[in-house]
C-alpha cells in the first residue's frame, strides 16, 4: 500500500506467513474495516466502524486510526462521524449484509491524512490527529444512488483531491433521488473546498451505471472506469479528453456494476469488465471517442 491506498510494490516479503509466523506485530481494531491501510514513513493509517453492543440502540461510530508502523501501537484514534446518514443522524447498522462504511481507503500527502466513508463523510486530520476540516459529499450534492454502500476511495495527485461518484440516475431501495448525475469532484486538500465538479455522462442503465473504482492518474490525465466505458480527463478542469468502450455493446446488460479500478503499464491501460467478462488492454495516447470496431482497433488483447 502507498499514500493513495490503491496500489503498491514491495519486496522482502516473508516466505512463510501465518498467525504465528512471519508476523512482527498484531493490533486489535476497535471495529470492522474493509479499507486498505496506507503507510507514510513511520505511520499506518486506516479506518474502522464500531457498533454499539446494545442492538436496540443502533448507534455506532466511524473511526480514523493512526498506528506506529514498527510496533502496531495505536498513536491516535478519532471519532470521524456518527451514524451513516448525511449529518451523522443515521443508524449505525449496515444497509445490507455485505457492506462496510469503512471501505474507502484513506490518503495522505505527508502533511495531512484524509478519510472518506460510505455515508459521504470526508474528514482531514493533521498527522498528529488534529481535525483540519470536514464535509459530507451527500449533504453537499445529494443522496447517493447505489444499491450497496458506496466505497470508492479518493485520490491525491499534485496537490488536488479527487473523488468519483458514478451512480444510478434513479433511486434504488429508497436511496437517492430521481435524475441523479454521476460526477467527478476535485477539492483542495488543505481546506476541502470544491475546485471543480464535472458531470460524467454515460449511456449505461441501472446497476451498470455504478462504479466503486478509484481515479488513477497517468501522464497528465485522470483515468476513470465505470458506466460501461473508460474515460480520460484533464486534472485541471475535469473535461473529458477521450472515451473508450464499451464492454457492454448496446448497454444491454443492466446489472454490470464495476468494482475494480483501471491499471496502467507498458503503454497499455487495463480495465476489467464485470461478471466474468474479459479484461481489456487498451493502448494509451487516445483522443476522441472510440467505440464499436474503432474501439476494438485500440485493444491489444
Go through each PLM region and give its residues.
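Noncatalytic, solvent-exposed loop/strand surfaces
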Residues: 1-301
Amino acid at each position: 500500500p502507498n499514500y493513495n491506498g490503491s496500489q503498491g510494490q514491495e519486496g522482502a516479503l516473508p516466505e512463510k506467513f501465518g498467525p504465528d509466523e512471519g508476523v512482527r506485530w498484531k493490533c486489535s481494531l476497535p471495529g470492522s474495516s474493509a479499507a486498505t491501510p496506507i503507510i507514510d514513513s513511520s505511520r499506518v493509517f486506516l479506518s474502522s466502524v464500531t457498533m454499539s453492543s446494545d442492538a436496540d440502540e443502533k448507534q455506532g461510530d466511524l473511526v480514523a486510526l493512526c498506528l506506529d508502523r514498527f510496533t502496531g501501537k495505536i498513536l491516535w484514534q478519532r471519532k470521524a462521524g456518527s451514524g451513516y446518514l448525511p449529518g451523522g443522524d443515521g443508524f449505525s447498522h449496515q444497509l445490507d449484509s455485505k457492506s462496510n462504511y469503512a471501505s474507502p481507503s484513506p490518503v495522505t500527502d505527508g502533511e495531512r491524512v484524509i478519510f472518506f466513508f460510505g455515508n459521504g463523510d470526508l474528514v482531514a486530520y493533521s498527522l498528529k490527529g488534529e481535525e483540519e476540516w470536514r464535509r459530507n459529499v451527500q449533504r453537499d450534492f445529494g443522496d447517493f444512488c447505489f444499491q450497496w454502500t458506496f466505497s470508492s476511495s479518493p485520490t491525491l495527485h499534485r496537490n488536488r483531491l479527487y473523488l468519483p461518484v458514478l451512480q444510478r440516475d434513479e433511486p434504488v431501495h429508497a436511496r437517492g433521488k430521481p435524475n441523479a448525475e454521476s460526477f467527478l469532484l476535485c477539492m483542495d486538500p488543505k481546506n476541502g473546498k470544491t475546485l471543480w465538479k464535472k458531470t460524467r455522462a454515460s449511456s449505461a442503465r441501472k446497476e451498470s451505471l455504478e462504479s466503486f473504482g478509484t481515479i488513477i492518474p497517468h501522464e497528465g490525465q485522470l483515468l476513470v472506469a465505470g458506466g460501461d466505458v473508460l474515460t480520460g480527463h484533464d486534472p485541471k478542469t475535469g473535461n473529458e479528453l477521450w472515451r473508450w468502450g464499451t464492454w457492454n455493446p448496446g448497454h444491454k446488460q443492466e446489472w454490470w456494476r464495476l468494482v475494480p479500478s483501471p491499471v496502467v503499464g507498458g503503454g497499455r491501460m487495463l480495465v476489467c469488465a464485470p461478471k466474468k467478462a474479459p479484461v481489456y488492454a487498451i493502448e494509451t495516447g487516445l483522443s476522441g471517442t472510440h467505440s464499436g470496431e474503432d474501439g476494438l482497433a485500440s485493444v491489444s488483447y
